Regions:
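Alpha-solenoid HEAT/Armadillo-like helical repeat scaffolds in large eukaryotic proteins
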Residues: 53-57, 61, 84-92, 116-124, ...
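Intrinsic disorder/low-complexity segments in short proteins, especially the signal peptide
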Residues: 12-13, 18, 26, 304, ...
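Structural detector for internal amphipathic alpha-helices that build alpha-solenoid repeat scaffolds
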Residues: 34-46, 64-78, 87, 96-110, ...
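Sec-dependent N-terminal signal peptides
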Residues: 1-20
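Compositionally biased, proline/threonine/alanine/serine-rich low-complexity intrinsically disordered stretches
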Residues: 20-52
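Compositionally biased regions
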Residues: 15-16, 20, 34-37, 245, ...
Length: 407
C-alpha cells in the first residue's frame, strides 16, 4: 500500500497487545444484529429526518453508531441520499462527517460525484483532498492533469501527497506526468519518494526504470521499494541488476529481491518457495521482524499481480497466527484485497472455511484506514452479492463479508 503502511506495520509489529480488530469497540467486536445478517432488499428508504440523523451520526465517537449510520445511508435510494450527502460535504460543521459523506458518495455511482470530487481537491481539510485526488485514480479525467501537476509544487500533506502522486501514476501515458514522476523518484523526502516509487511500479511505469535501477543499487530506506517496483514493471532485462543485488544484499532485502525476480517471470517457483521459507523462519524465530515484513510484503505483491498460490500461503499461515506475524500477514492480505479484489474473493471463496481469512481482512482494514479503497471493496462485494444466485457460495461469502466487516 502507500508509504503510510510502513509506519502502520512498524507500530503493529512492535506491539504485543491484541490487534485492533480483536480489541473491544473495534470492527466486529460485537455480534451483528439479526436484521444485519441478511441483505433482504437492495434499498431501504429513509425519511428526511432519519437521513439527517444518519449523516450527523457519521461523526460519532461510538463505532457502532457511526457504522450503523453508514450502513443505512448506503442502503437508502441514491436519488434521495445524494443531494443530502453533497450538502453535508459542503456545509456540515463536523469535518469528519464531511469526509465520511464524501467517501460514501464515491460508491453511489452518481454523475454529480465528479464535480464534488473536483471541489474536494481544493478543500482545506486534508481528508477531503485525499479522497478527491484518490477518486480520480480509478475515475480518470485527463482534463484535471494540469491542476494535479501544479499541486505537486505546493501539496505537502503526508496523507494527501501520496494520493495525488498515485493518481498521476495512473495517467502514466501522459508525457508531462512521466517527466514529473521520474524526477520525484530521485529527489524529495524519502516518505514521498517511497509513495511515488510504489505507484510507478503498480502502474508498470517503464519510463522511470533507469531512475528506479539507480535507486535500487543504493543502500537505504528506498532500496526495497525500488527493487519491488522494478519487478512489477516486468522488464526481464532488469534481472541482471537484481541478480547482482541478490549476491550481496543483506538478509532482510532477500525476500524483496526474490519477489521482484518472480514478478519478472523468472524461476518463480523457486523464489516463491524461498519467500515461504523466510516467512516460516521469521514467524518461528524472534528477532527477524524486518525479514517478516519483507516476506509478507513479497507474497502480497505476488498475490496482487495474480499469483493465487501466494494469496493461499498468506491465508494458510495467517489464520492460526499471532502477533507480530499476524499483523504483517494481515497487512499483506489487505493490500491484495484492495488492489485485486476479484482475485482475492475468488481465492477466499475456494477456502474450506473463509472466516479466518475474513478476520484477517478486518484487522487489515482497521490498520490501513484506507476509507476510499475500502468503500470500493464494499461496492464490489455488495454488487457480487446481488448478482450471485441465492444460497450460492459467492452469495454466502459476500454475506459473511458484509456482516463481519460491518459494511
Amino acid at each position: 500500500m502507500r508509504a503510510v503502511v510502513a509506519l502502520l506495520a512498524t507500530v503493529a509489529l512492535s506491539s504485543t497487545t491484541p490487534s485492533a480488530f480483536q480489541a473491544a469497540g473495534a470492527r466486529g467486536a460485537a455480534p451483528a444484529s439479526p436484521q444485519s445478517r441478511v441483505e433482504t432488499q437492495r434499498e431501504t428508504a429513509l425519511t428526511p429526518e432519519q437521513l439527517k440523523t444518519a449523516i450527523d451520526n457519521l461523526g460519532k465517537v461510538d463505532y457502532a453508531v457511526r457504522t450503523a449510520a453508514a450502513r443505512s445511508i448506503r442502503r437508502a435510494p441514491a436519488a434521495a441520499v445524494v443531494p443530502s450527502l453533497i450538502d453535508a460535504i459542503a456545509n456540515h460543521s463536523d469535518g469528519y462527517v464531511r469526509f465520511r459523506a464524501l467517501v460514501i458518495l464515491s460508491g453511489l455511482n452518481d454523475a454529480r460525484t465528479h464535480d464534488v470530487m473536483v471541489q474536494a481537491m481544493s478543500a482545506k481539510n486534508d481528508r477531503l483532498r485525499t479522497v478527491g485526488y484518490a477518486y480520480f485514480e480509478h475515475n480518470q479525467d485527463p482534463l484535471l492533469l494540469p491542476r494535479m501537476l501544479g499541486a505537486l509544487e505546493t501539496e505537502s500533506s503526508e496523507t494527501v501527497r501520496p494520493a495525488l502522486t498515485r493518481t498521476l501514476a495512473a495517467h502514466g501515458t501522459d508525457v508531462r506526468v512521466r517527466e514529473a514522476l521520474t524526477g520525484l523518484v530521485i529527489k524529495g523526502q524519502d516518505y514521498f519518494r517511497s509513495a511515488v516509487i510504489e505507484a510507478i511500479g503498480d502502474y508498470k511505469g517503464a519510463y522511470a526504470l533507469p531512475s528506479l535501477l539507480q535507486v535500487a543499487k543504493l543502500d537505504g530506506p528506498l532500496q526495497d521499494d525500488a527493487v519491488l517496483a522494478i519487478g512489477k514493471i516486468g522488464d526481464k532485462k532488469s534481472v541482471e541488476i537484481l541478480a547482482s543485488l541478490q549476491r550481496t544484499a543483506p538478509r532482510a532485502l532477500q525476500p524483496t529481491i526474490a519477489a521482484a525476480i518472480c514478478l519478472l517471470g523468472i524461476n518463480c517457483s523457486s523464489h516463491q518457495g524461498y519467500l515461504e521459507q523466510s516467512l516460516k523462519f521469521s514467524m518461528d524465530t524472534d528477532g527477524f521482524r524486518d525479514l517478516l515484513r519483507a516476506s509478507t510484503a513479497g507474497l502480497g505483491a505476488l498475490g496482487t499481480a495474480g499469483n493465487t498460490d501466494a494469496i493461499t500461503q498468506l491465508l494458510d499461515y495467517g489464520g492460526p497466527s499471532r502477533d507480530p506475524a499476524r499483523a504483517a500477514i494481515a497487512l499483506a492480505l489487505g493490500a491484495v484485497a484492495l488492489r485485486n479484489t476479484p482475485l482475492f474473493l475468488k481465492v477466499l471463496q475456494a477456502r474450506p472455511d473463509p472466516k479466518p481469512g475474513i478476520a484477517l481482512l478486518g484487522e487489515a482494514f482497521d490498520m490501513l484506514e484506507e476509507d476510499l479503497e475500502e468503500e470500493r471493496f464494499y461496492v464490489t462485494v455488495r454488487r457480487g452479492y446481488w448478482a450471485a444466485a441465492e444460497n450460492s457460495p459467492a452469495r454466502k461469502l459476500a454475506e459473511t463479508l458484509i456482516q463481519t466487516l460491518e459494511f
